[in-house]
Amino acid sequence: MTCAPIRSVVVVGGGTAGWMSAAAIARVLGARCSIRLVESDEIGTIGVGEATIPQIRQFNQSLGFDEDDFVRKTQATFKLGIQFVDWGRLGDAYMHSFGFLGRERGLLPFHQYWLKAMLAGSGGDLGDYALNVVAALQGKFMRPAALGPDSPLSSIAYAYQLDAGLYARFLRAFAEKLGVRRTEGKVRDTVLRAEDGFIEAIVLESGERIAGELFIDCSGFRGLLIEQALHAGYEDWSHWLPCDRAVAVPCASSGPLTPYTRSTARGAGWQWRIPLQHRIGNGYVYSSHHISDDEAAATLLGHLDGEPLAEPRVLKFVTGRRRKIWDRNCVAVGLSSGFMEPLESTSIHLIQSTITRLLSFFPDTGFDPVLIERFNQKAEFECLSLIHI
């Protein structure tokens, strides 16, 4: 049976997740579908996921963004990798860089030749064979140059360190030009269809009723639609990842910007450092069973590059994921779908991958259950692969 195409999409929640969703759907579907985003300025966004991985460039390019304009308006810096400090033992540091390592020779991967050289006493540090590592540690960056396939400068892999709030604003301006309609308000109730439990509409505190065919839940940890209305369920992964809180604070820059994010091991977790053009983003992810909020804040404040620009803010979370990212006619994107501590800078990437998957599996009004099940299987596999990196 042929079902009618989706003609109306309602996005609940703004921030990075909401506006990435609205912008991408509007870009792909255009005038074929009306898109309405509901958010409230009274509800703050988390906005600590400021580090990205190279796939974000594909997302921006697919929307047609000019990179210079994007960097300028989001106060972004370029990122060649992540430096891990004190993880093996105090004083240790290594750079997990993007891009290639060495050059393939014959049938064997490069690291096999390096291992042979190490056994012979002449291999040297593995990072010396990675362009991104060498450049990052010297504070250097350049965009890929058209120098031919044999030049390592022709395929430089990089990402961004950005202000998530400014990125959401940038996306909003783009989405609204494409016809996305923003409504200010808080959701008071969710109306479900009696016959199948699908979401029929949301009701705002003002009394306005907003109907839709497909709903995107970007409401954050509370999962306003996916959990509070549809009860999709949540898998708690605290037994694998015991960190359950983060304290975040921005500080002033005190030196040259570094083209990498830093992750430093601490007694009860780890600390991030993300350099932006106008400030440095800092946070301490920790287990509340091993350290108090005040102790965590004191530790963070004692390891800043410059003067703090705000009071430390504590965020509470339960590591895990929704049992169903897509349930009936609702898809959870961002924190409403789950949370994993951003050790590998994957928070914004998971938003991107969920949106990309949704567009690949975009339904009609029949909402084929086989399609939804396959979507959820892929989402589960992705999350499990990330925690086992």
Per-segment meaning from a language model:
Residues R7-C33:
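N-terminal Rossmann-like FAD-binding beta1-loop-alpha1 element of flavoenzymes
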Residues A26-V48:
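Glycine-rich FAD pyrophosphate-binding loop
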Residues G44-A136:
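Dinucleotide-binding Rossmann-like beta1-alpha1 core, especially the glycine-rich loop
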Residues A93-F170, F174-L178, T183, C218, ...:
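Low-complexity, highly charged intrinsically disordered N-terminal segments
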Residues P149-A296, I355:
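Predominantly flavin-linked oxidoreductase catalytic cores and closely associated redox partners
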Residues R266-V318, S336-Q352, F361-D368:
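Conserved FAD/dinucleotide-binding core of flavoprotein oxidoreductases
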Residues I387-I389:
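Conserved small/polar residues in nucleotide/adenosyl-binding loops
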